Amino acid sequence: MGIIVLKNEGLNFHARISTPLSEIDDDIQKELLDLTKKVKVAGFRAGKVPVSIVKKKYGTSVRHDIIEKRINNLVNHIIKEYNLNIIGRPKIEELQNEPDKDLEFTVKIELLPKITIPDLKKISLDRPKLAVNSQDVEIQLEKLAALTKCYTKESKTKIKDGDQVTIDAIGYIKDRAFDGGKLNDFKVVIGSNTLIQGFEQQLIGSKTGNEVDVNVTFPENYHDKNLSGKDAHFVVQIKAVHTAEPTIIDEEFAKKFQSNSLEELRTHFAKQIENESEEAINTIMKMNLFDKLEKLLDFDVPESLLEQEKNILKSETDKNKHDGSLLNGKSSKEITEYYNKLALRRVRIGLLLAEYAKFKNLQLEPDDFKKIIMQQARNFPGQENMIFDFYKNNPRAIEGLKGPALEDKTVQYIFNNEIQLKEKRYTKEELEKYLETEEQRISLI
């Protein structure tokens, strides 16, 4: 075997490899002899087929298999001999495999960079913490009370905000009734915004037995494209009006919601309010950590990974164009620079986290997959069971979660064991503003 190293610098290793024709022919001959004992050919006893017959019938495919096997063995030998930390599949070029010449080819191998893990203990980050106050809790209790109102008291007075109204209605567009525009014995709480914007407000001041003309415009993004953006006229019959008995928030109220006391229900809501912001906080904390890491990392990255990441970015941008892409109005040069910078950031951080996970021997457990599937399910409200069933019935889809699951586990390990976290307390209103600002920022990265 002959090896001529053509390039061994940065993350690229190129070599020209050759192996004598005699060795190839020996391997082919040996394989053909083995086949004479296995193949069945009409007119010959089993195991007695002449090698010339076998060669005529199988020679081409045997040679192809031997060449492929020899190339793989030679490439693996090169990788081991030069201790190459490769990424992806080696590329075989300029292959010379004529039957009367030595086997020669050029192999091009892309390498992973040597990564030095920075001192993560020097990183310091603020961690937002929601300071839940009694007013936040009382607002949630009042919302719960509003949802559980009993509309039992019939009212003969004029309709006001908060009343429950039972109606019949027929909708018209240009004086023609349209499909889906008819309501019978429909109950709506005024101010709940259950119906099209402006509909409920036009019932205020009417009484049971009145006929009311309601004029509305369907929103442009209405689910029925035949109605979106169109003006409509509804003829509404007021059949009944009910007011709710006042809901008293007391110990008995709390017991309706599996709480032993009102204080226990308040504690439950305080914890719920805290938890509602946790996922958003964790996402922002992760991006803030990545911002710090980006400044510490300067190693070269494999070109193939960079191109792959740029293609993902382009695909994401194309998918979200209708949302008003940040690249709208940018020159092709600016767009290229954006893709290059962001792809480099993502690849560097991804490689560092993979190296760190390997160094710390972090392994995925079943609970890690459950956690990330739960995160996926939360993105599809009302379809959670469908998401769970999908992953349960598609083991290969679970494989696709390994990368994100290990990244999340590694980031959490770094938060728990490496960097310095300083708690910064926010009121609910302050935290909502902070999260909104940060979510807009990280949407760009």
Curated annotation (Swiss-Prot):
The keyword Cell cycle applies. Pfam families: FKBP_C, Trigger_C, Trigger_N. It is an enzyme of class 5 (isomerase). Residues 162-247 form the PPIase FKBP-type domain. SUPFAM superfamilies: FKBP-like, Triger factor/SurA peptide-binding domain-like, Trigger factor ribosome-binding domain. One of its GO terms (biological process) is protein unfolding. PROSITE patterns: FKBP_PPIASE. Keywords: Cell cycle, Cell division, Chaperone, Cytoplasm, Isomerase, Rotamase. GO terms for cellular component: cytoplasm. GO terms for molecular function: peptidyl-prolyl cis-trans isomerase activity; protein folding chaperone; ribosome binding. The keyword Cytoplasm applies. Its EC number is 5.2.1.8. InterPro entries: PPIase_dom_sf, PPIase_FKBP_dom, Trig_fac, Trigger_fac_C, Trigger_fac_C_sf, Trigger_fac_ribosome-bd_bac, Trigger_fac_ribosome-bd_sf, Trigger_fact/SurA_dom_sf. It is found in: Cytoplasm. It catalyses: [protein]-peptidylproline (omega=180) = [protein]-peptidylproline (omega=0). Consists of 3 domains; the N-terminus binds the ribosome, the middle domain has PPIase activity, while the C-terminus has intrinsic chaperone activity on its own. Belongs to the FKBP-type PPIase family. Tig subfamily. Involved in protein export. Acts as a chaperone by maintaining the newly synthesized protein in an open conformation. Functions as a peptidyl-prolyl cis-trans isomerase. This is Trigger factor. It comes from Rickettsia prowazekii (strain Madrid E).
